């Protein structure tokens, strides 16, 4: 899905150790498809504003293949070493991380990471410890696929939704799951209609990986369905619902309320 291009590399299987001087030096990062300034800032333990200042950017837009200078320390991790190829290790999940981010950091695929930890879904929680498999093949870049109804348009767009908003988060979450969507569906309240126009199945029945959409408020809201429970309730992940922009949380929707939402498959 997403891959990182680091200026610091490991040779002959040896781990590359960062000195204090290296940690403060500027690092060159090549933007990958689906990345945003916020996700890059999180990986390098810096801020969006710092990256914008270092690169004289007037807005938050970045494009695949663009090389940017990233100040501050190297990507967040539990140590200051790059994971050694062929060696098993563990990783403690940090707030805001996803399986794709972690897999890219350690050079393994999401499928390998899920298999090593017996995960049946993409849901992980902060402070959860994950085992990193030996000798991974590296993450893969998201590719366009058809929707679940077989008639949806294919997309491999850059995320142009406003960073930190629910739409921005759900766009990235679907890309991580291998089911990319359009970056031109506008505000959340328009998503169901625009998705239907693009050929996606839209109904009131949730499924894992579908997008939950509601229209109240000036912009509406969207969330990602992580799990459908046996009692008919659903677990969703979302951003900018309770704690403001860039804050992701999980929420359970009672079975009695599920049918009041639209679901994009």
UniProtKB/Swiss-Prot annotation:
Record carries keyword Repeat? yes
The cross-references to CDD domains, in alphabetical order and at most eight, read: LysM (cd00118)
Q: Which reaction does it catalyse?
A: Hydrolyzes the link between N-acetylmuramoyl residues and L-amino acid residues in certain cell-wall glycopeptides
What's the protein name? Answer: Probable autolysin SsaALP
Q: Which organism is it from?
A: Staphylococcus aureus (strain NCTC 8325 / PS 47)
- Supply the PROSITE patterns for this chain: CHAP (PS50911), LYSM (PS51782)
Question: What is this protein's function per UniProt?
Answer: Has weak lytic activity toward S.aureus cells.
Q: Can you give the residue ranges of the Peptidase C51 domain?
A: 141-265
Write out the biased-composition intervals (Polar residues): 74-92
Q: What EC number(s) would the UniProt record show?
A: 3.5.1.28
């Amino acid at each position: 899905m997403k891959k990182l291009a680091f200026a610091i590399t490991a040779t002959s299987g040896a781990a590359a150790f960062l000195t204090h001087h290296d940690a403060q030096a500027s690092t060159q990062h090549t933007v990958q498809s689906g990345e945003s300034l916020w996700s890059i800032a999180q990986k390098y333990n810096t801020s969006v504003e710092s990256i914008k200042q270092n690169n004289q950017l007037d807005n938050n837009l970045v494009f695949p293949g663009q090389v940017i200078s990233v100040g501050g320390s190297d990507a967040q991790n539990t140590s200051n070493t790059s994971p050694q190829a062929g060696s098993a290790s563990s990783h403690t999940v940090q707030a805001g991380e996803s399986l794709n981010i972690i897999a890219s950091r350690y050079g393994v695929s999401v499928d390998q990471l899920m298999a090593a930890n017996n995960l049946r879904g993409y849901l992980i929680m902060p402070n959860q410890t994950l085992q990193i498999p030996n000798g991974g093949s590296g993450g893969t870049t998201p590719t366009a696929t058809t929707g679940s109804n077989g008639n949806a348009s294919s997309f491999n767009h850059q995320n142009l939704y406003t960073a930190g908003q629910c739409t921005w988060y759900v766009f990235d979450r679907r890309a991580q799951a291998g089911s990319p969507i359009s970056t031109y569906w506008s505000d959340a309240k328009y998503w169901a209609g625009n998705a239907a126009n693009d050929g996606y199945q839209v109904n009131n029945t949730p499924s894992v990986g579908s997008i939950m959409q509601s229209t109240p408020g000036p912009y509406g809201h969207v969330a990602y369905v992580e799990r459908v429970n046996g009692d008919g309730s659903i677990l969703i992940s979302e951003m900018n619902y309770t704690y403001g922009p860039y804050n992701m949380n999980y929420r359970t929707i009672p079975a009695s309320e599920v049918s009041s939402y639209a679901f994009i498959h």
